[in-house]
Every structure is written in C-alpha cells, then in structure tokens.
Amino acid sequence: MAKAELMDYDEAIEMFEPVLGFEVHVELNTRTKMFSDAPNFFGGEPNTNITPVDLGLPGSLPVVNEQAVKHSISLGLALGCEIAPSSRFARKNYFYPDLAKNYQISQFDEPIAFRGSVEVEMPDGRIVTVPIERAHMEEDAGKLTHVGGATGRIQGADHSLVDYNRAGVPLVEIVTDIIYGAEGEAPELAKAYMSTIRDIVVALGISDAKMERGNLRCDANISLSPRGSGKLGTRTETKNVNSLRSVERAIRYEIQRQAAILAAGGTITQETRHWHEDTGRTSAGRPKSDADDYRYFPEPDLLPVQPSAELIEELRVALPESPAIRRRRLKAEWGFTDLEFQDVVNSGLLTELVDTVEAGAAPQAARKWWTGEIARIANARGVDAATLITAEQVASVIELVEAGTLTNRLARDVIEGVIDGEGTAQEVVDARGLAVVSDDGPLIAAIDEALQAQPDVLAKIRDGKVQAAGAVIGAVMKAMRGQADAARVRELVLERAQAS
C-alpha cells in the first residue's frame, strides 16, 4: 500500500476508536524442551536439538517439563492471575511445514492462569491497567527460513528451509482481554506493555526475553470502531513483531491503513499480517482462523496439571518485586531525576541500563551512552539499540573513559567500532589509535604553536582573561584529533601562556 493510501494518523483517531489486543509468546529458559529431553538453547546447527517427540514420530510420547510448569505459574502470579487448581493440555490442529506432527500441544479451555492485570507506565508517567484474560502453556513450532526473496518473507522466495530445533521449546502465551480507551496513544501503549512484560519475565528469571532472538514475540491485534457506533470492527493480527520499536510502528501503521480503507467505504479482511521493518509496512498473510477452525480436543497422552496449594504459595512468596516498585527503587538508587528516569523507561532500555550498571558502569554514564549515542546510531540504522551492542561492551567503553584512556568524543568512535564488529573496546582503541595522549610533550608542542599563531589571545590570557584560552584549547584539540584530555590541555595552556 502506498503512503498516499494511508490516512493521516490524527485524522484516523478523530474518525475511529482503536481497539487493541495482544498475544505475547514468552520462550522459557528451561534446560530441556516442553515435552521432550531435547536440549533447549538458542543456536546450534539446524535440526540437531530434536527428538522423536519433537518430530511427532510414531510411538513417541510427551512428558511435561516440571520446571516449565513452575515458570508458568510464577508468570501467572506476577501478572496478578488466578492459578487454576487443574489445567489440561489440548491439541491445536493445523497444517504448516514448521509443525511436524500437524498439531501443537497447547491449552484451550483450561489454562494454567487466568483473570489478571498488569500496570503499564505510559511515556507521560501515567499508569494504565491492561487486563489479562489468560496465560497458557504450549510448545513452540519450528522455524522457516525463506530463501530467494528480497525481504526474507515467503513472498518471492524460491524455497523454504525448516529447522525443528525450536519445535517443542516451552512457551507461555499471555493473552490480554480487549483493550479499550487507548485512543491516539495506542502505539505508545503497545510499546509500554511489551516493555513491562519484558521487565517482568527478566525479573522472574524465566526467559532471556531477547526479542531479536524470538525469546519474546508479540502478535498485535488491532481493529477500528467508527466513533459512536458501539460496534467492534474486524481485526487484523500482525504476527511475530520482534522489537519494541516495531510494535509501536506496526500499530500506528495498521491504524492508518485500516482507517483509509474504511473511510473509502471498503471492508477490513480478518487476517494475519506480516510487519516489514525495512519498509515500515504490513502485508497480508493468511485468513485469520477462529478457535473452531483448530478443532481443539484434549491431549490424550498427558494428564491434567494440578499444582498443590503449597507449591503455588511457595512460588508466590518467591516472586521478585513488581516492575513499578523496582523502577522506584532503581530511580532512588541511581539518583536520577524524574525526567532522567522517564527518559530511560520511554526508550525501552531499562533492562540494558540495569545490566550495564551490574557490569560495573556508573548509572549516569550508562544512561548517557544508551539514551544518547547508542540510541542515535540505532535510530539512524532503523533497529533497536539493544540489538547493536551488549551491556558488557558498553560498560567496557565507560571504563576506558573513566580511566582517562578515552575522551567522550573518542568513546563515540569506539562505540561505533564495537557495533561494527571491529572487536572489544580495547581492541578498537588499539587498532584505530584512539587512546588519549598521556605524554605532555606533544601537547606542549601543539600549545606553543597555537599560542604563537594567536598573539592577541596570548595577550588576553596574560591580562587575566582566562576565558580567552578556549580558542587555543580548541585549536590544540583539533591538532591532537581529539586525543587529549581537555582539562589537562587547559591547565597547560595557562601555564605556557605565562611562561612564554
């Protein structure tokens, strides 16, 4: 769809009310898969972390992963849900190449957790309560790689490759109830909700929640209701959006796209849609199925899950602090102002900041680099900052700045080098020759040359007008290509001016 076919966002909100819903898939970091003893870890050669159970081979039987059940209960409790005294698995039947046995073991009418809510902090600091309908356990499907197309999607691909390493990885799917009232802030609410869910699962320690790896994936449902109609519109489901930035952009795009169609007298097709980060657009996937289409029926090879009241209470007591309480604590510990902390929250980089501080960096320095230079590079490249560089790498750059090895200007070059894969921070410094000059000899030579070239400035400094030294300091820093400590240069400029 061309940009001309998108309605202006503000105009769309005037005409229609956005109605939202989210299905978030959280991959659990258990040692083995949900129903087999195949190892559960990211990466590995394709089709190596598999067993007959994962492939649905005749005679293979599933066994429930106890740790996955405990993780699921913990997540349900953290979402304020009721925990079912008895829940059961069901077969969700559909045919797709990444599902070897042609059904997925999931939960249908008896989920492990239900009726909860989560508090989400909006960019302006307001708290919005998002209703949670349910959280249920299931297994992940395999991964398809489409070869030959320009975008990596199935459209235009020559063929597809299937990797079943991910098949059977334990998941919890968090399903919200219908979300009304988001209005023009629907995209911001989507991003804030995903950021909050990520904070929760990371705090629980049940998932790495790295969206770029698929540990945390969002299916975003959006429909538009004409103002005053009281009727729900036809929804679309944008699948597997894998970054906070993309969630926000995808919701905004769908509102504009659907509004343009409805305003022109068209109808919305109930379908799944794929988000394309490179074009900032969604494209049609397949018709969206209803529950009846999946022909759910109880999984005959698994008994109901019946956690004891003692286990549930044990897991409840072990819950970490809530995201809201954690944020208040971190703000106080780090000494941030309200504005500084809100800037971090709005950027979606709180987890990265926590990890950088834990790696040894000062909180203010970590904030400056993540929300400043790294965010700038991420925006320029159209990606999430968290995908560019690790917290440990950022902490190592900050350490070099604190040690006086780098100036802030030089550190920006080092950050870019690390992001571009040139090595560790120290390796980039060595390879590019970026370290601050610690020998006063070259500095004095550059200072004397600058003073001789600016006799009027020299006279002003001698007359006590030390602010005039700025021109000389600038010339020296330029001559040293920024590889000098500005404070030391200033000190030497004043000394040499009086000695000349």
UniProtKB/Swiss-Prot annotation:
A Gene Ontology molecular function term of the record: asparaginyl-tRNA synthase (glutamine-hydrolyzing) activity
Family matches, as NCBIfam families: gatB, PRK05477.1-2, PRK05477.1-3, PRK05477.1-4
Protein name: Aspartyl/glutamyl-tRNA(Asn/Gln) amidotransferase subunit B
GO biological process annotation, one example: glutaminyl-tRNAGln biosynthesis via transamidation
Record keyword Ribonucleoprotein present: no
Catalytic activity: L-glutamyl-tRNA(Gln) + L-glutamine + ATP + H2O = L-glutaminyl-tRNA(Gln) + L-glutamate + ADP + phosphate + H(+); L-aspartyl-tRNA(Asn) + L-glutamine + ATP + H2O = L-asparaginyl-tRNA(Asn) + L-glutamate + ADP + phosphate + 2 H(+)
Pfam families to which the protein is assigned, alphabetical: GatB_N, GatB_Yqey
Keyword ATP-binding tagged: yes
HAMAP family: GatB
EC class of the enzyme, as a word: ligase
Enzyme Commission designation: 6.3.5.-
Family note: Belongs to the GatB/GatE family. GatB subfamily.
Keywords: ATP-binding, Ligase, Nucleotide-binding, Protein biosynthesis
Summary of the function given for this chain in its UniProt record: Allows the formation of correctly charged Asn-tRNA(Asn) or Gln-tRNA(Gln) through the transamidation of misacylated Asp-tRNA(Asn) or Glu-tRNA(Gln) in organisms which lack either or both of asparaginyl-tRNA or glutaminyl-tRNA synthetases. The reaction takes place in the presence of glutamine and ATP through an activated phospho-Asp-tRNA(Asn) or phospho-Glu-tRNA(Gln).
Subunit structure: Heterotrimer of A, B and C subunits.
